[in-house]
């Protein structure tokens, strides 16, 4: 049982740790101590639900709906392009931008909307949780699947809260003007790169 949980935890971390839209957004909220725990909590909740659905048979739902997957993919492309351009604009404005005009600080509703956007409009999230974790988890006997799912869910909790708390703890250094400009630039390029990757994959598959 413990070995199965450890497998779920290890595979879950392997899926979550590579930089992506969720990680970049939680990191940016942590740097500004701007509802970072809210963002981390919502990312975790979405992951817990999707991991549970995937491990207990939901992987077939995504595979059986190519039209839905295509709509999700292109919606994700548009969202990631918007997010990337927004981050690059913030980097370009730099320290001279007025705080009121800066996209770096957000209200609760904006953080909720953005977190749901980088999660539910991100096809990689579904591929990781529903397809990969779901397919791997389905190989276990039914009595062991809850242990595997628990391990993967624990990985999500540990990672997102560590990222949020770590970014907040290092915010005095990370929030410096030039450092923040560099982070905004990197995040923007990552978002545009993910959008390009999604778009090219969708075009090749069509």
Swiss-Prot record:
Transmembrane segments: 1-21, 37-57, 65-85, 116-136, 148-168, 185-205
Source taxon at top rank: Bacteria
GO cellular component: plasma membrane
Molecular function terms, GO-annotated: amino acid transmembrane transporter activity
Keyword annotations from UniProtKB, A to Z: Amino-acid transport, Cell membrane, Membrane, Transmembrane, Transmembrane helix, Transport
Compartment(s) where it occurs, according to its Swiss-Prot or TrEMBL record: Cell membrane
Membrane topology of this protein: Multi-pass membrane protein
Pfam families on file: LysE (PF01810)
Location (main, coarse): membrane
Family: Belongs to the LysE/ArgO transporter (TC 2.A.75) family.
NCBIfam families in the cross-refs: 2a75
Protein name: Putative amino-acid transporter YggA
Species in which this protein is naturally found: Aeromonas salmonicida
Lineage: Bacteria, Pseudomonadati, Pseudomonadota, Gammaproteobacteria, Aeromonadales
